[in-house]
Amino acid sequence: MDYLTMFYDGWRDLMDNKSDPRTRDYPLMSSPFPTIAISLTYAYIVKVLGPKLMENRKPFELRKVLIVYNAAQVIFSAWLFYESCIGGWLNGYNLRCEPVNYSYSPKAIRTAEGCWWYYFSKFTEFFDTFFFVMRKRYDQVSTLHVIHHGIMPVSVWWGVKFTPGGHSTFFGFLNTFVHIFMYAYYMLAAMGPKVQKYLWWKKYLTVMQMIQFVLVMVHSFQLFFKNDCNYPIGFAYFIGAHAVMFYFLFSNFYKRAYVKRDGKDKASVKANGHANGHVKALKDGDVAPTSNGQANGFHNTFSKFTTDMCNPALNSSTRQRVLVNAGNK
C-alpha cells in the first residue's frame, strides 16, 4: 500500500504541480486517461467493430462527404500552420534551441491555445479511418495507418500538458504544412476519375512525410549536444523517438507501395510485351518479325516440294531428284 500511495501522490504532484497551469483547465487536459481511452476505442472500432458491422452491408457512397470533409481539413490544417508561424516559427523562434514561454503574454497564450487545437485535430483525423471502414476499403486500414492515428493524440497530449510551445512545436509546424497537401490530395481524389488522372504526385506525399520526420529527428536530437535554452530534454527524446519510429514505418510503406511495385510493374511490362508479341503472332497467323524471313522461305520451299511431288507428269527419277534437293535445302 505504501508504494501505491507514493505512486499516487507522485502522479498527482506531476499532474497538478509540474504541468503548465495555463492549459490545466482545457478540455481533456486533466488526465491522459480519457485520451488513451478514446484512442483505444478508435483502434477497436476500425479494426474489429467497424468491419463486423459492415460485414453484410454494402459500402457507403461518400464522395460528396469526402470532398467536404477533406476541404475542411485543408482549411483547418492551413489555419494551424498559420498559427504556428505567427506563434513563433516565422516570428522569432530559434531553430537551434527555443525554450517554452510559460508567461501569460498574448503571444504565449496564443501559442498554447494553438497547441491544444493541434491536439484536437488528431481526433478529427480519426474520420479518415472511419470513412475507409464505411466504404469497405480495409486495405487502407493498415497497421501503419492505425498506429499513426492512434498514437498521435496521446503523444500530443503530453506536449500540451507540459510544454505547449517552444522547441518541440516544430513537429506540429511541419506536420500541419504536410497535411495541407495531404488533405488536398484526398479532396481531389474524391472528385472522381476526371481529376484522379492528374494526381500522379501521390507517392511524393509519403516522401514529404519522411522528410518531415528526418527534419524533426535532426531538430530534436541536436539538443543532446547543446541545450542552450534549457528546454526539457525528456521531451526532445520523446519527439525524436516518435520521429524515428514513424520514419521507419513510412519508409517500409514506401518501399512496399512504390519501390517493389514499380519493380514488379517493369518486369510485368517486359514479360507481357515479349509474350504479347508472340501471342499476337499466333493469333493473327503470323510469326515473330525476327523469324519471318526464315519462316516464309520454309513456307515457299515446302509448297514447291509438295507441288512437285504430287505432279503426276513427273517420273520416278525426277521425283527422287526433287526429294534429294529438298533434303539439301
Swiss-Prot record:
UniProt entry keywords in alphabetical sequence: Fatty acid biosynthesis, Fatty acid metabolism, Lipid biosynthesis, Lipid metabolism, Membrane, Transferase, Transmembrane, Transmembrane helix
Protein localization: Membrane
Pfam families xref list: ELO
Major localization class: membrane
Domain of life: Eukaryota
Cellular component annotations (GO), alphabetically ordered: endoplasmic reticulum membrane
Membrane topology (UniProt): Multi-pass membrane protein
Bilayer-crossing regions: 26-46, 66-86, 114-134, 146-166, 170-190, 205-225, 233-253
InterPro entries in UniProt: ELO_fam
GO molecular function, one term: fatty acid elongase activity
Family: Belongs to the ELO family.
Keyword Transferase on entry: yes
Enzyme Commission number(s): 2.3.1.199
Keyword Translocase belongs to the record: no
Protein name: Very long chain fatty acid elongase 7
Disulphide bond pairs: none
Recorded catalytic activity of this chain's protein: a very-long-chain acyl-CoA + malonyl-CoA + H(+) = a very-long-chain 3-oxoacyl-CoA + CO2 + CoA
One GO BP annotation of this record: very long-chain fatty acid biosynthetic process
Disruption outcome: RNAi-mediated knockdown leads to lethality before eclosion. RNAi-mediated knockdown in neurons leads to neurodegeneration in the central nervous system including degeneration of retina, defects in the fenestrated basement membrane and ommatidial disarray. Effects are probably due to altered levels of very-long chain fatty acids (VLCFAs). In contrast, glial-specific RNAi-mediated knockdown results in no defect.
Function summary: Catalyzes the first and rate-limiting reaction of the four reactions that constitute the long-chain fatty acids elongation cycle. This endoplasmic reticulum-bound enzymatic process allows the addition of 2 carbons to the chain of long- and very long-chain fatty acids (VLCFAs) per cycle.
